[in-house]
Amino acid sequence: MATLKEKLIAPVAEEEATIPNNKITVVGVGQVGMACAISILGKSLADELALVDVLEDKLKGEMMDLQHGSLFLQTPKIVADKDYSVTANSKIVVVTAGVRQQEGESRLNLVQRNVNVFKFIIPQIVKYSPDCIIIVVSNPVDILTYVTWKLSGLPKHRVIGSGCNLDSARFRYLMAEKLGIHPSSCHGWILGEHGDSSVAVWSGVNVAGVSLQELNPEMGTDNDSENWKEVHKMVVESAYEVIKLKGYTNWAIGLSVADLIESMLKNLSRIHPVSTMVKGMYGIENEVFLSLPCILNARGLTSVINQKLKDDEVAQLKKSADTLWDIQKDLKDL
């Protein structure tokens, strides 16, 4: 007796399992992981989305909730499991998992606890998707990108930290607000370490090719009557303020990660400030990851732009590199 489905649908091609073309995995379904997931779905970047976490109920609930929105999305398959086999054949894996910093906890201690989490996660990712590109989002992102690179054995062009992509987006938004224009028309770069010791490259800030520092030579310095330096200070403080107000940040970082993925999956060769291995650049001698303007395309992070930096900016980069290496050199089990 033919089923309703058999009566309704006459097959033309043989049914066979197809390997996804643009599968994306998000590891960790906390606030940041789910913001990445919804941003990826909203931009229709994946033909399959996989979610992984250790919390099975939360994981299943998030998966079902997204699946129920399938009518409004163009991603035909949304799957989730605590077993990493669900991630097989991913093009891109986004890592948002990790432990939170406890009050009074040193960064070294926080990083070491995250190393122990990553020691479980990273080998599993590589086992099931040996050709994937990994985007690390968990904080402290620059150190955890190094940790991921070490644990994965992947070439450095396939291990990328979300780095200063969001810091630069915040910077451009805040400057554009002051000027009354759209952030996409206000160009500026924040480089180096994600967070407190990031470097604002004032010499490169421009609107329609007009250098703002040429109009105001004191821009970014303490002598600036318009106090543009405050904009960079606001970038650094903005995450803390959002956390104070709502408990965490998630939407902007989710959108920022989807932006990086779009550049790679669509082979756009756009330039983003993301965390990459900077040994040998700007006189940095250790294996640390910091954000520089990088070209992202289908192969991953394929090139770095040689940004003209001033001496004090290079000094800041080196200082960040030393700070990171101080922590990295004491990490166990890498």
From Swiss-Prot:
It is an enzyme of class 1 (oxidoreductase). It is a peripheral membrane protein. The modification Phosphoserine is found at residue 44. Pfam families: Ldh_1_C, Ldh_1_N. SUPFAM superfamilies: LDH C-terminal domain-like (SSF56327), NAD(P)-binding Rossmann-fold domains (SSF51735). Substrate binds at residues 107, 139, 170, 249. The active site is at 194 (proton acceptor). NAD(+) binds at residues 30-58, 100, 139. It catalyses: (S)-lactate + NAD(+) = pyruvate + NADH + H(+). It comes from the Eukaryota. InterPro entries: L-lactate/malate_DH, L-lactate_DH, L-lactate_DH_AS, Lactate/malate_DH_C, Lactate/malate_DH_N, Lactate_DH/Glyco_Ohase_4_C, NAD(P)-bd_dom_sf. Signal peptide: none annotated. The modification Phosphotyrosine is found at residue 240. Its EC number is 1.1.1.27. Keywords: Acetylation, Cytoplasm, Membrane, Mitochondrion, Mitochondrion inner membrane, NAD, Oxidoreductase, Phosphoprotein. The modification N-acetylalanine is found at residue 2. Interconverts simultaneously and stereospecifically pyruvate and lactate with concomitant interconversion of NADH and NAD(+). HAMAP family: Lactate_dehydrog (MF_00488). Belongs to the LDH/MDH superfamily. LDH family. This is L-lactate dehydrogenase B chain. The lineage of its organism: Eukaryota, Metazoa, Chordata, Craniata, Vertebrata.
